[in-house]
From Swiss-Prot:
Residues 32-140, 150-234, 242-324, 399-498, 500-592 form the Ig-like domain. It holds the Pfam family Ig_3. The chain crosses the membrane at residues 713-733. Glycans are attached at residues 611, 637. Keywords: Disulfide bond, Glycoprotein, Immunoglobulin domain, Membrane, Repeat, Signal, Transmembrane, Transmembrane helix. It is a single-pass membrane protein. This is V-set and immunoglobulin domain-containing protein 10-like 2. InterPro entries: FN3_dom, FN3_sf, Ig-like_dom, Ig-like_dom_sf, Ig-like_fold, Ig_sub, Ig_sub2, IgSF_CEA-related. The keyword Membrane applies.
Length: 776
């Protein structure tokens, strides 16, 4: 008996010997590709470029599997792959079949090639009943080839109507049988139409103009179906006999007629491909080329015979048609309708002068027919109870007109109410009162009133009045009164003239030297609209071009940005001024620029304050507050402290320092700071102040959670224990007080500035073991 000695090693000599026993023939020698008598190879199909899996169904798990391949037309059996379960090997020559791999005992071929078409033999080594057996499985693999994209070929892409045309659907490759279908799409047609089945050739005999358009063919086999690009068949034909149309359309016994001074359009159309070339004649004289001839203003001299000649230049053929045009002269244009506004009544006017005879006109309204007259007619109509959107029509009739001609007037109530606004003009010397109430028909009438006294004349849809600017206009109220026939009296709007009022964001701003300062003010009210501006400490107007200053207008707000604050140039009182034609108002903002001095005496005249160090910085109230404690050292006078914060630890990406507290008394040594975001890590520093002189900033620290206190636990144990436990606990606290660094602390070490003269010493940690025994 022959067996495998190991399942987790590469193929060894014993396995190779077994396969030599399995292999009926040597590699490269002829070997019968069919099974024994009565057996047939299993048929398997695969698609080129896809994957196929050849299964070797052998029953029990085999000890080894060998796959071989015999191409069609060959008797040479070629090894493909071998596996023992624990290891496998694929022959390099298997690349001709595709990307070959083994999945258990199955042979998987990806990116299948046509060279894989042929017979496959699966030989397996089995152990059954203590004996080694071999099994064989024959498979026949058929590789199917998808059809390639077809292409339509026309023997004549531009035939003349009446000849024979053949279209061929050419396919480069594809497994037969192939199925063909033809589709036709006319340029102005609704869509594709099936015109042929099964044949690769489509014959159009004889071809006519209905065959013009795009032709596509579809080819399919068992694998796929593809459609060709369209091929255009351009059928040459025509021209047919031209058809002449006249607009506006009017028929007479001898042809067409049109009204004098109307625009008359004569159009000619003759079916032809390529399109016809058109030439117009009047009484045998050429007057125009092109399919359309337009008489911009017809007169009686345009009466005559008009001929359209259509010419196909490709075939050099032509046809023609002649019609007669007669010009009549009714009244010019059409009736003209107008409406005049009066209180409670509308006066409707309709006129249509000229023509022979005069046109007959009559009005018709929502409640019936109105008056009639010749040439012009007037109708005064009471608007009481008249709905919005009422339509009045004036009908004009003339013997030369087949249909009456209308003009219409629709009465519309203007929406809403009048709208008032005011602007200043000519250097604030005048104030312009403006009032508007659009959208009405007839237009609304508007007028300005001052204490019920009319100002100026009535205006239609809009009223404007100029006032000379003067201070006594402040507080005065002006009314714009509107009226319309369809609305109830009393529609108005009012304006109150006011001197501007403003407010500042902060009346006092303090920044350190070299930092940015922001001063803000907002306009609260003012009519006419006011202009905001900033004045510097020397009462000079600050503009966008002023060095060191940037203005940020935001609607009714104007913010002033002071860059690189300098106490010598930027300290002082700034004014935000609001100005309109009635006057102005202002608010002051004091900007303090605090100096950081490097020596004992600052250039500003105040001695340098002492240095400050942060001794404790802990969180409070779920990290929404911090408790800050500090100490001072070194000589110097002080008048207070300044605390700064920023939303990150010090780094190149850290934000600018912001003032967290500045009104701290000189005797204070702690401060609680609130308004923090629990999700943000803050950094803090503190400076001592001597009037406007700032000392060195302290080291930068970030807050930590408060350390755990052992007092409650110890006292509880002492209360329930013996005196010995109490004495031992007191010894623990005494030792901790003398050696604070021997106990762990949750506060992280802070970074001290390199300029800080004081460096903290850190003792080496001491391990202490304390045992407390309490007896209840």
């Amino acid at each position: 008996m022959v067996g495998l000695s190991a399942h987790h090693r590469p193929l060894g000599c014993r396995l190779l010997i077994l396969f030599c026993l399995l292999h009926p023939g040597a590699s490269g020698q002829p070997y019968p590709t069919s099974n024994t008598a009565g057996e047939e190879a299993l048929s398997v199909q695969g698609v080129r470029g896809s994957s196929v899996e050849l299964e070797c169904r052998t029953g029990p798990a085999p000890m080894a599997v060998l796959w071989s391949f015999t191409p069609l037309g060959s008797l040479v059996l070629q090894p493909v792959a071998v596996t023992s379960g624990a290891s496998s090997k694929v022959e390099s020559g298997a690349l001709a079949l595709g990307v070959v791999s083994l999945r258990n005992s199955s042979l998987v071929i990806e990116e299948l090639r046509e060279g894989a078409r042929g017979h496959f033999l699966c030989q397996t080594l089995l152990v059954s009943g203590g004996q080694v057996h071999t099994a064989y499985l024959y498979l026949m693999l058929t590789v199917l080839v998808p059809v390639s994209k077809p292409r339509v070929q026309l023997n004549d892409p531009s035939p003349v109507e009446g000849v024979s045309v053949v279209a061929t659907c050419a396919v480069r490759e594809g497994t037969e049988p192939l199925t063909f279908s033809w589709h036709h799409h006319m340029p102005q047609g609704p869509g594709e139409v099936l015109v042929g089945l099964s044949e690769p050739r489509l014959q159009l005999d004889p071809v006519n103009r209905t065959h013009l358009g795009w032709y596509t063919c579809s080819v399919s086999n068992v694998v796929n179906q593809l459609k060709s690009d369209g091929a255009f068949l351009d059928v040459i034909y025509g021209p047919d006999k031209p058809v002449i149309t006249v607009e506006p359309l009017g028929f007479s016994e001898d042809g067409f007629w049109a009204s004098e001074r109307e625009e008359v359009t004569l159009s000619c159309l003759a079916a032809s491909n390529p399109p016809s070339h058109y030439v117009w004649f009047r009484d045998d004289s050429q007057i125009h080329t092109g399919p359309t001839y337009i008489i911009a203003s017809a007169s009686r001299t345009h009466t005559g015979l008009y001929t359209c000649l259509a010419h196909n230049r490709h075939l050099d053929t032509h046809t023609q048609t002649t019609v007669q045009l007669i010009i009549y002269y009714p009244p010019e244009g059409q009736p003209s309708c107008a409406v005049l506004p009066t209180l409670g009544v509308v006066t409707l006017l309709c006129t249509w002068p000229g023509g022979f005879p005069n046109a007959q006109l009559h009005w018709e309204g929502p409640q019936g027919i109105g008056p009639s007259a010749s040439g012009n007619v007037t109708w005064s109509y009471t608007t009481t109870g008249l709905p919005n959107g009422s339509i009045f029509s004036c009908t004009g009739q003339h013997p030369t007109l087949a249909m009456p001609i209308f003009c219409r007037v629709t009465l519309w109530e203007p929406p809403g109410s009048p709208t008032c606004w005011t602007t200043a003009t000519v250097g604030d010397q005048y104030i312009m009162l403006s009032c508007e109430w659009p959208g009405g028909e007839p237009p609304a009438m508007l007028s300005w009133l001052d204490r019920q006294q009319s100002l100026g004349d009535l205006g239609s849809s809009q009223a404007v009045h100029l006032l000379q600017a003067q201070s006594d206009l402040a507080g005065r109220e002006f009314t714009c009164q509107g009226s319309h026939p369809l609305t109830a009296p009393g529609s108005h709007c009012r304006l109150r003239l006011e001197v501007p009022q403003l407010t500042v964001a902060e009346p006092r701003v303090s920044v350190l030297e070299g930092e940015e300062a922001w001063l803000g003010c907002a306009l609260q009210r003012g009519t006419p609209p006011a202009q905001l501006l900033w004045l510097g400490p020397q009462q000079q107007q600050l503009e966008g071009s002023t060095p060191g200053f940037i203005l940020h207008p935001e609607g009714t707000h104007l913010r002033l940005q002071v860059r690189d604050a300098d106490p010598a140039h930027h300290r002082g009182t700034y004014q935000c001024v609001a100005r309109n034609a009635l006057g102005n108002s202002s608010q002051s903002v004091l900007l303090e620029v605090l100096s950081e001095c490097k020596g004992f005496v600052c250039p500003c005249g105040y001695p340098t304050p002492p240095n400050v160090t942060i001794s404790r910085l802990t969180y409070r109230r779920q990290r929404r507050e911090v408790q800050l404690q500090w100490a001072i050292y070194g000589p110097g006078n002080l008048t207070g402290f300044l605390v700064q914060q920023r939303a990150s630890v010090p780094s190149s990406e850290a934000g600018a320092w912001e003032v967290a507290a500045s009104d701290i008394e000189p005797e204070s040594r702690d401060r609680r700071l609130g308004g923090l975001d629990p999700g943000v890590l803050y950094a803090f520093r503190i400076l001592a102040m001597n009037h406007h002189t700032a000392g060195y900033p302290s080291e930068v620290k970030t807050p930590v959670d408060p350390a755990f206190s052992a007092y409650p636990a110890v006292l509880g144990a002492a209360g329930t224990g013996v005196v010995v436990a109490l004495a031992t606990s007191l010894l623990v606290f005494q030792y901790a007080a003398r050696h604070p660094h021997t106990f762990p602390c949750t506060e992280t070490a802070s970074t001290t500035s390199s300029s800080d003269p004081i460096q903290e010493s850190i003792d080496a940690p001491v391990n202490v073991t304390i045992t407390v025994t309490a007896t209840p």
